[in-house]
UniProtKB/Swiss-Prot annotation:
Compartmental location: Cell membrane
Entry membrane topology: Peripheral membrane protein
Main localization of the protein described in the UniProt heading: membrane
Assembly mode: F-type ATPases have 2 components, CF(1) - the catalytic core - and CF(0) - the membrane proton channel. CF(1) has five subunits: alpha(3), beta(3), gamma(1), delta(1), epsilon(1). CF(0) has three main subunits: a, b and c.
Lineage: Bacteria, Bacillati, Bacillota, Bacilli, Lactobacillales
Superkingdom assignment: Bacteria
KW Ion transport (keyword) present: yes
Family: Belongs to the ATPase gamma chain family.
InterPro entries, alphabetized: ATP_synth_F1_ATPase_gsu, ATP_synth_F1_gsu, ATP_synth_F1_gsu_CS
Protein name in UniProt: ATP synthase gamma chain
Pfam families: ATP-synt
UniProt function note: Produces ATP from ADP in the presence of a proton gradient across the membrane. The gamma chain is believed to be important in regulating ATPase activity and the flow of protons through the CF(0) complex.
């Protein structure tokens, strides 16, 4: 067999072997995606109910405190509430009261531990660098808590301030597994390491689509504090022992931990979807390449056969 045909045959065999590997990786990613989607769906329902509970308890507590002070709460003066005056100095005020000045911002950035996931890692890093640049323009310090070795290596290589890093989060993370991560992030905020905490990650929309998110986790700002009338209607739905503030002091840190874990789980779901899409694309490209190489090999064979037949006919004519 001529060298060109032999080379084409080897390339076809190599590409076929590669396509088998990428197809297997596609199936593995699809299985992991199915697991994380199921867990994420169930967890989102839990998180929704927890958010609803904390929001209503907070509304009831604020009203109780303000009623004692004969303070009329309206939609116009909600933002002027001083939570230190309402709750006193403590965990509740620490979790929900914005700092007077924001000198540093913490970013818990979720990336993967490996490649072969399409643009999953690069898009998060690109958006993160944009946030860091904005902080620099505003005179704020950016402090990064990195989850995932791809992000950790990039941020340290580019001399960013990485105050915490964690690699090797499992493909289907549990709340218990991520508890050290989220607890450290919250503790750093309460200790004044940074004045705000954001979680930056890729949100899973569906198998073919995802979107970058930078969600503010601390101070907690998305509790439903509406008009006084709305809160009064919510207040009667709970009978709390020993008292609302004691329950809130326990629930608010748990609420923050739940929000951060939900973001990490969402990011892992997006990672598996991106990996599945990338491996399917690689498999399809490999199959197309095999078809193209096979066509080249067939043409080369035809040319070889034509040449050999021509030589045979020419030799026979020469003998006559």
């Amino acid at each position: 067999m001529p060298a060109s045909l032999l080379e084409l045959k080897k390339r076809i065999a190599s590409v076929k072997q590669t396509s088998k590997i990428t197809e297997a990786m596609h199936m593995v990613s699809a299985a992991k995606l199915n697991q994380t989607e199921k867990r994420d769906k169930g967890y989102q329902e839990y998180n929704r109910l927890l958010h609803q509970t904390v929001s209503r308890l907070m509304s009831a507590s604020v009203i109780n405190h303000l009623n004692k002070a004969n303070y009329r709460l309206t939609q116009d003066n909600i933002d002027s509430i001083d939570y230190d005056d309402v709750f006193g100095m403590g965990i509740i005020s620490d979790m929900i009261k914005p700092r007077e000045e924001v000198h540093s911002v913490g970013y818990l950035v979720v990336t993967g531990d490996r490649g072969l996931v399409g643009s999953y890692n690069s898009s998060v890093i690109k958006q993160m660098m944009s946030l860091v640049a904005d902080d620099k323009l505003q005179g704020r310090e950016s402090k990064i808590l990195s989850v995932g070795s791809v992000g950790s290596q990039f941020f340290k290589k580019n001399n960013l301030n990485v105050v915490y890093e964690k690699d090797g989060v499992s493909d289907v993370p549990t709340f218990k597994e991520t508890l050290p991560i989220v607890s450290t992030a919250i503790k750093m905020y309460l200790n004044g390491v940074y004045d705000e905490l954001y979680v930056c990650y890729t949100h899973h929309v569906n198998s073919l689509s995802s979107a970058f998110r930078a969600e503010k986790m601390l101070p907690i700002v998305d509790l439903d504090i509406g008009t006084m009338e709305a809160k009064e209607s919510k207040k009667i739905e709970f009978e709390v022992a020993p008292d609302i503030d004691s329950v809130l002091a326990t629930l608010l840190p748990q609420f923050a931990r739940a929000e951060i874990y939900g973001a990490i789980l969402d990011a892992k779901t997006a990672e598996h979807a991106s990996s599945m899409t990338a491996m399917k694309s690689a498999t399809d490209n490999a199959k197309d390449l095999v078809s193209s190489l096979s066509l080249q090999m067939n043409r080369a064979r035809q040319a070889q056969i034509t040449t050999e037949l021509t030589e045979i006919v020419s030799g026979a004519n020469a003998l006559e």
